[in-house]
A protein has these predicted regions:
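Alpha-helix N-cap/helix-start motif at helix boundaries, enriched for small hydrophobics
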Residues: 1-2, 9, 13-18, 121
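C-terminal catalytic core of tyrosine-transesterase DNA break-rejoin enzymes
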Residues: 3, 7, 87, 104-128, ...
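Conserved tyrosine-mediated DNA breakage-rejoining catalytic core shared by Y-recombinases
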Residues: 8, 17-55
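Short coil/turn motifs that cap or connect alpha-helices
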Residues: 11, 19-21, 128-131
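Catalytic-site neighborhood detector that most strongly recognizes the C-terminal catalytic loop/helix
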Residues: 34, 125, 130-150
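Active-site/catalytic core of tyrosine-dependent DNA strand-transfer enzymes
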Residues: 46-95
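Catalytic tyrosine of NAD(P)H-dependent dehydrogenase/reductases that use a Tyr as the general acid/base
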Residues: 97-101, 136
Protein backbone atom coordinates (compact mmCIF):
# COMPACT_ATOMS: atom_id res chain seq x y z
CA UNK A 1 0.00 0.00 0.00
CA UNK A 2 2.78 2.39 0.92
CA UNK A 3 4.61 1.85 -2.37
CA UNK A 4 1.50 2.45 -4.51
CA UNK A 5 0.40 5.47 -2.44
CA UNK A 6 3.85 7.04 -2.70
CA UNK A 7 4.66 6.25 -6.34
CA UNK A 8 1.33 7.58 -7.58
CA UNK A 9 0.75 10.41 -5.10
CA UNK A 10 -2.62 8.97 -4.14
CA UNK A 11 -4.98 10.48 -1.63
CA UNK A 12 -6.19 8.04 1.05
CA UNK A 13 -9.63 7.79 -0.56
CA UNK A 14 -8.11 7.13 -3.99
CA UNK A 15 -5.87 4.38 -2.66
CA UNK A 16 -8.57 2.46 -0.83
CA UNK A 17 -10.94 2.79 -3.82
CA UNK A 18 -8.51 1.02 -6.19
CA UNK A 19 -10.05 -2.04 -7.79
CA UNK A 20 -8.35 -4.87 -9.61
CA UNK A 21 -9.92 -3.74 -12.88
CA UNK A 22 -7.90 -0.50 -12.43
CA UNK A 23 -4.67 -2.48 -12.72
CA UNK A 24 -3.62 -3.30 -16.28
CA UNK A 25 -1.09 -6.07 -15.75
CA UNK A 26 -0.58 -6.60 -19.50
CA UNK A 27 0.52 -3.04 -20.21
CA UNK A 28 1.87 -2.10 -16.75
CA UNK A 29 -0.61 0.68 -16.09
CA UNK A 30 -2.70 1.90 -13.19
CA UNK A 31 -5.96 3.69 -13.94
CA UNK A 32 -6.50 6.33 -11.26
CA UNK A 33 -9.77 8.14 -10.64
CA UNK A 34 -8.84 11.37 -8.91
CA UNK A 35 -11.14 12.17 -6.00
CA UNK A 36 -11.05 15.96 -6.12
CA UNK A 37 -10.64 16.75 -9.81
CA UNK A 38 -12.74 13.82 -10.95
CA UNK A 39 -10.39 13.38 -13.87
CA UNK A 40 -9.07 9.91 -14.59
CA UNK A 41 -5.40 9.41 -15.37
CA UNK A 42 -3.22 6.50 -16.34
CA UNK A 43 0.09 5.97 -14.55
CA UNK A 44 2.87 3.56 -15.46
CA UNK A 45 3.55 0.76 -12.98
CA UNK A 46 7.14 -0.24 -12.26
CA UNK A 47 8.19 -3.86 -12.43
CA UNK A 48 8.49 -3.87 -8.64
CA UNK A 49 4.91 -2.65 -8.29
CA UNK A 50 3.60 -5.17 -10.82
CA UNK A 51 5.29 -8.04 -8.99
CA UNK A 52 3.94 -6.87 -5.62
CA UNK A 53 0.42 -6.41 -7.00
CA UNK A 54 0.45 -9.81 -8.72
CA UNK A 55 1.53 -11.45 -5.46
CA UNK A 56 -1.12 -9.54 -3.51
CA UNK A 57 -3.84 -10.58 -5.97
CA UNK A 58 -2.72 -14.21 -5.89
CA UNK A 59 -2.62 -14.33 -2.08
CA UNK A 60 -5.73 -12.23 -1.39
CA UNK A 61 -8.25 -14.23 0.66
CA UNK A 62 -11.12 -13.91 0.37
CA UNK A 63 -10.98 -12.61 -3.20
CA UNK A 64 -12.27 -9.08 -3.62
CA UNK A 65 -12.76 -6.58 -6.44
CA UNK A 66 -10.75 -4.14 -4.26
CA UNK A 67 -6.96 -4.17 -4.36
CA UNK A 68 -6.48 -3.44 -0.67
CA UNK A 69 -8.58 -5.29 1.86
CA UNK A 70 -8.53 -5.83 5.60
CA UNK A 71 -7.62 -9.15 7.18
CA UNK A 72 -11.33 -9.99 7.12
CA UNK A 73 -11.57 -9.31 3.40
CA UNK A 74 -13.51 -6.04 3.62
CA UNK A 75 -12.34 -3.11 1.49
CA UNK A 76 -9.70 -1.14 3.39
CA UNK A 77 -11.12 2.13 4.71
CA UNK A 78 -9.44 5.54 4.54
CA UNK A 79 -9.59 5.68 8.35
CA UNK A 80 -7.94 2.26 8.59
CA UNK A 81 -5.22 3.40 6.20
CA UNK A 82 -4.61 6.54 8.27
CA UNK A 83 -4.28 4.44 11.44
CA UNK A 84 -1.92 2.03 9.72
CA UNK A 85 0.37 4.83 8.51
CA UNK A 86 0.37 6.45 11.96
CA UNK A 87 1.41 3.11 13.51
CA UNK A 88 4.16 2.70 10.91
CA UNK A 89 5.44 6.18 11.78
CA UNK A 90 5.58 5.29 15.48
CA UNK A 91 7.32 1.98 14.71
CA UNK A 92 9.87 3.85 12.57
CA UNK A 93 10.59 6.21 15.47
CA UNK A 94 9.39 9.43 13.84
CA UNK A 95 8.92 12.35 16.22
CA UNK A 96 5.89 13.65 14.31
CA UNK A 97 2.47 12.17 13.67
CA UNK A 98 2.75 10.49 10.29
CA UNK A 99 -0.27 10.55 7.97
CA UNK A 100 -0.93 9.22 4.45
CA UNK A 101 -0.91 12.65 2.81
CA UNK A 102 2.81 12.83 3.62
CA UNK A 103 3.34 10.12 1.01
CA UNK A 104 1.50 12.27 -1.54
CA UNK A 105 3.66 15.27 -0.65
CA UNK A 106 6.81 13.13 -0.81
CA UNK A 107 5.81 12.03 -4.31
CA UNK A 108 5.30 15.63 -5.41
CA UNK A 109 8.62 16.82 -3.97
CA UNK A 110 10.53 13.85 -5.38
CA UNK A 111 9.18 14.36 -8.90
CA UNK A 112 9.78 18.13 -8.72
CA UNK A 113 13.36 17.53 -7.55
CA UNK A 114 13.80 15.14 -10.48
CA UNK A 115 12.97 18.05 -12.79
CA UNK A 116 9.42 17.08 -13.81
CA UNK A 117 7.74 20.19 -15.19
CA UNK A 118 4.91 21.80 -13.23
CA UNK A 119 2.13 21.04 -15.73
CA UNK A 120 3.06 17.36 -15.95
CA UNK A 121 3.25 17.17 -12.17
CA UNK A 122 -0.15 18.85 -11.91
CA UNK A 123 -1.68 16.23 -14.20
CA UNK A 124 0.08 13.36 -12.42
CA UNK A 125 -1.17 14.45 -8.98
CA UNK A 126 -4.62 15.37 -10.28
CA UNK A 127 -4.55 19.00 -9.13
CA UNK A 128 -7.25 21.24 -10.59
CA UNK A 129 -5.45 24.37 -9.44
CA UNK A 130 -1.81 24.82 -10.50
CA UNK A 131 -1.11 26.68 -7.23
CA UNK A 132 -1.37 23.39 -5.36
CA UNK A 133 1.38 22.01 -7.59
CA UNK A 134 3.65 25.05 -7.45
CA UNK A 135 4.48 24.37 -3.78
CA UNK A 136 6.51 21.34 -4.87
CA UNK A 137 8.45 23.11 -7.59
CA UNK A 138 9.19 26.27 -5.57
CA UNK A 139 11.57 24.35 -3.34
CA UNK A 140 13.11 22.14 -6.02
CA UNK A 141 16.79 22.98 -6.55
CA UNK A 142 16.59 21.62 -10.10
CA UNK A 143 14.33 24.47 -11.18
CA UNK A 144 17.43 26.62 -11.79
CA UNK A 145 19.66 23.97 -13.36
CA UNK A 146 19.25 25.10 -16.98
CA UNK A 147 19.38 28.85 -16.38
CA UNK A 148 23.03 29.15 -17.38
CA UNK A 149 24.85 26.97 -19.81
CA UNK A 150 28.60 27.46 -19.78
Amino acid sequence: MVLVAYRHGLRATELVALRWDSVDFNHGRLHVNRAKSGSPSVHPLSGRELRALRRLQREQEPKSPFVFTSERGAPFSAAGWRKMVARLGVAAGFDVLVHPHMLRHACGYKLANDGIDTRSLQAYLGHKNIQHTVRYTELAPTRFKDFWRD
